């Protein structure tokens, strides 16, 4: 019995067998966290691009009274896909609905505007683009994460009418 207790052969294999599950959890958890932050970065970049696109549209595309834009569908497409084409693939997997992107317009009438905004009686229009997309988990099929996790972002741009 003493020889069996003092025998150290196989100790490293036993330690490895105990550590592998923990190492796998850490490794795949790191993959999932990295993918989440990458997806979050993509939606932040998408709303910035959508707001930037909206800011370059002419002043006539915006109605300050109703807070809407006649070009809302194009702005939503640019935000969701990166281009105005409706057949382009989405930037985030499963982000297929333009209803997930909202476009709103506010006009600053409290300030006296000059420059390119001088002729606008309703003030300088500011476009806000907001978006929400469901997070496409790397390991969602395994049932490890809730399927209702969303990523969201918003961005604003002053309409330059260029």
List the predicted regions and their residue ranges:
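Transmembrane signal-anchor/signal-peptide helices with a preference for the extracytoplasmic
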Residues: 32-38
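Conserved beta-strand segments that form the floor/walls of ligand-binding pockets within enzyme
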Residues: 5, 19, 130
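N-terminal leader/signal peptides at the extreme start of proteins
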Residues: 1-11
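Residue-level signal for short amphipathic helical patches enriched in basic/charged
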Residues: 8, 34, 57
């Amino acid at each position: 019995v003493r020889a069996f207790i003092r025998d150290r052969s196989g100790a490293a294999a036993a330690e490895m067998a105990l550590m592998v599950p923990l190492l796998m959890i850490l490794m795949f958890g790191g993959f999932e966290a990295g993918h989440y932050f990458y997806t979050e970065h993509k939606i932040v970049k998408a709303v910035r691009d959508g707001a930037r696109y909206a800011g370059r549209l002419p002043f006539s595309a915006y109605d300050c009274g109703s807070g809407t834009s006649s070009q809302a569908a194009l702005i939503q497409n640019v935000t969701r896909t990166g281009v105005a084409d409706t057949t382009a693939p989405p930037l985030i997997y499963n982000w297929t609905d333009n209803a997930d992107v909202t476009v709103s317009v506010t006009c600053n009438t409290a300030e006296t505007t000059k420059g390119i905004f001088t002729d606008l009686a309703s003030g300088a229009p500011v476009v806000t683009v907001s978006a929400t997309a469901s997070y496409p988990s790397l390991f969602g099929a395994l049932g490890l994460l809730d399927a209702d996790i969303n990523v969201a972002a918003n961005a604003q741009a002053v309409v330059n009418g260029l």
